[in-house]
């Protein structure tokens, strides 16, 4: 509710890349924390920022996690620990599961074994699943009834949306298992780029479909132009995020790695 607080990762998408929507539209106060290297939030640090029952502070009500975060899947052991933690602290638990199916494929489990730990879960039908558009919010009947009202209030109602739903259903029925192909291609990309001395990359950190490349020591604008002239499109500077997906094949990985190597040679 208005004036209450949620705890969230400093680099979480819901905190950093949604135009301040939680504050602007929800009037709720974020308490950001730094992610650990494995994409988790340290529960001791979370406990330390939960506000006391004092009118000087916003009441802490919610903990938000992201899975995957930077391509890393949260372990089930961690999720069990978090579930016990929020129960003890009387907090609700939300998952930004935009790529929850990448996490489930990496962990070799059904997505419901991840989702069951949370009070609410959102996930994308696009991104890895390949639908043209759409996201889903999951939760209790009461939560979804409340969310639908807010969606309408904010102008989110749609007409003749069945064609979008059809694409989403196809993605859920056909495109989950194939996510392992994206993960394999990301590993190939990481291995190839790791052979380039001027780039810094940790192949062991590549669990799903994201490869992060430290390119702070090079001219990224020049690199981007060169790669574009060789049929490879990237964006960003300093830290490059390369994402494999439905439209990327192994031959495309080979093309990309060759283009990167040609630039540095």
Predicted features and spans:
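Conserved PLP-enzyme active-site core in the AAT-like
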Residues: 1-203, 207-217, 221-248, 256-264
């Amino acid at each position: 509710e208005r004036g209450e607080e949620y705890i969230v990762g400093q680099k979480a998408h819901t905190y950093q890349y949604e135009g301040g929507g939680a504050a602007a539209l929800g009037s709720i106060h974020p308490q950001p924390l730094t992610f650990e290297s494995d994409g988790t939030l340290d529960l001791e640090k979370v406990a330390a920022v939960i506000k006391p029952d004092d009118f000087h502070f916003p009441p802490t009500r919610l903990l938000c996690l992201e899975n995957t975060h930077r391509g890393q899947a949260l372990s089930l052991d961690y999720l069990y620990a978090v579930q016990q933690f929020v129960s003890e602290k009387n907090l609700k638990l939300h998952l930004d599961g935009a790529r929850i199916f990448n996490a489930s494929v990496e962990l070799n489990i059904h997505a419901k074994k991840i989702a069951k730990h949370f009070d609410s879960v959102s996930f994308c039908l696009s991104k890895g699943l390949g639908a043209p558009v759409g996201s889903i919010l999951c939760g209790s009947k009461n939560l979804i009834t409340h969310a639908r009202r807010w969606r309408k209030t904010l102008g989110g109602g749609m007409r003749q949306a069945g064609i979008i739903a059809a694409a989403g259903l196809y993605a859920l029925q056909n495109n989950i298992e194939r996510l392992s192909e994206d993960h394999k291609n990301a590993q190939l990309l990481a291995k190839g780029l790791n052979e380039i001395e001027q780039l810094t990359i940790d192949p062991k950190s590549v669990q799903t479909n994201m490869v992060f490349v430290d390119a702070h020591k090079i001219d990224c604008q020049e690199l981007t132009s060169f790669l574009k002239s060789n049929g490879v499109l990237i964006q960003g500077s300093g830290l490059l995020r390369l994402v494999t997906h439905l439209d990327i094949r192994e031959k495309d990985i080979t093309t990309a790695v060759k283009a990167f190597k040609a630039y540095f040679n």
